[in-house]
Amino acid sequence: MRYLSFRKNSQIIAAGLLLADTNSILDLSHQSCIGLLGNTQPNLLDMVKLGLEPISKRIKESLKNDPPDKDAVIELKDVTFCAPIPNPGKIIGAAYNFTDALDERSLPYPKEPVIFIRSGLTTIGPYDPILIPPDVGNVGYEAELAVVMGKRALHVEPDVVMKLIAGFTAHNDVSGSGMIKEDKGNFVRGKNMPASAPFGPYLVTPDEIRNPYAIDIQLKVDGKTLQDGSTAKMYFKIAELISFISKQMPLEPGDIIATGTPGGLAMVHSPPAWLLPGQMVQVDLPGVGFLTNPVKQGVPYFEQ
């Protein structure tokens, strides 16, 4: 199933489900759907915490037996998407985790996963602008497959990891490469610029993904292909990666793991393909999601 978060009005973000026609969604906050969600609110993070599997089962049975209430159906063209998990507790990224990206820069393969933490406050959704702060240069793109945790993970072994996953989504791990270089490889500043972590449009449940290591990853800037790779080049696979992270810190439902990016990074192009205000970036992971974001300069406004 393909879940989403969408904005109903300026105050309310609700959960939805892409319907079989792929042209409309089911508004899970509609009164006709409340009984399908169990004892939780119609937002995707709460649903993940309760457990998406039983919710999905109830929804499938309901749709099989009866068509949805027409007032609960919204045409896709009228939906304002948010990130599937708009406020994740934390985002853990994997650096240096695709062999083609390492090979093109003549970098050694790491002996263990190299990870960094992003604030959940860097999250934005489809069509939201990627914001480049004033006086910050050398900002790069990184198209990635992201994993949303469905259950707590602490000191877990690889053989149980896939049972703990709620789903997958597309991600652009926008990075201040200039700051990372200035900080001698420290990721904190370069990976935590506000409005620099697009996700979406959907949280795709694991049963929809036949093989997570056979997903094409493509990124275009203004229509020009700059990354064209595959999760087949992932060095530390999902189970091994999440197991490693769980032995460094607890992972909670709704936390997001960004699994790394293929070759074609901005610095390897000639001239370097750093992101610039006015550009349009598209991330395409067939079967997972197509993510589009404009690039602007500025800082976001946070309401108090």
Question: Where are each of the predicted segments found?
Answer:
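Residue-level marker of beta-strand positions
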Residues: 2, 90-91, 144, 256, ...
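A generic local secondary-structure boundary/capping motif
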Residues: 4, 81-83, 103-106, 130-139, ...
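Structural signature of FAD isoalloxazine-binding scaffolds in flavoprotein oxidoreductases
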Residues: 18-19, 108-126, 141, 276-287
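Residue-level recognition of short, solvent-exposed, well-ordered loop/turn junctions
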Residues: 86, 93, 140-142, 252, ...
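Short, structured patches in soluble enzyme cores that scaffold and shape functional sites
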Residues: 96, 118-120, 134, 141-145, ...
